[in-house]
Design a protein with these regions (language model features):
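Helix-biased detector of long, well-ordered alpha-helical tracts
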Residues: 1-180
Length: 180
């Protein structure tokens, strides 16, 4: 059974994704592409870290369960987790919510979750974009959700310095998380 639970069998081709990252690197001539987040060094030496992500197929669970109040928390976590693993402290977050028809009940539950995720992450919900696209999305329950987070590095983490026998902490899951 476990051999069936992998990216390839779910229709995702990791090799093609990696090839696309190489295409992006070629086009942009950037060696900073390919990690979970990007680091930008300002002229004064301050380092900002940015990440964008989505909640992936967890949107399907929202629709099946008719539960939309926690997906925003997941969205913030997906983005913020990608910057904190670089040693960044989250500063702010922006969201992108696209749907066929704006349903105020669903939308307010989603934004409540995003706001809660920002509170839990100690970052500001700075803004976002709401896009009604009835030609692209079938109805109010057919939508996509993405986010963008920015943080600042105060204490750098050097992954190459991590070695065997270093202490690793595991945290208990709060439930089913997103796959991005």
């Amino acid at each position: 059974m476990s051999s069936l639970l992998n990216y390839k069998n779910s229709g995702v081709n990791i090799e093609t994704g990696n090839n696309f990252i190489n295409i992006i690197k070629n086009i942009t001539k950037s060696e900073h592409i390919g990690g979970f987040s990007g680091v930008y060094e300002c002229k004064n030496g301050t380092k900002l870290v940015a990440s964008t992500d989505g909640v992936g197929s967890k949107l399907e669970l929202c629709n099946i369960l008719d539960k939309y109040d926690t997906i925003g928390i997941d969205l913030v976590a997906m983005c913020v987790n990608d910057i904190i693993c670089q040693g960044a402290t989250p500063l702010f977050f922006l969201d992108y919510y696209a749907m066929g028809k704006l349903n105020l009940d669903i939308a307010s539950k989603i934004i409540t979750g995003i706001n809660e995720g920002c509170k839990q992450s100690n970052c500001l919900l700075l803004g976002g974009e709401t896009a009604e696209m009835p030609i692209t999305y079938k109805n109010d329950k057919h939508f996509d959700l993405a986010g963008f987070s920015v943080g600042i590095i105060e204490n750098e983490i050097y992954p190459k310095q991590i070695t065997e026998n270093d202490l690793l902490f595991g945290l208990k899951s709060t439930g089913i998380h997103s796959n991005g």
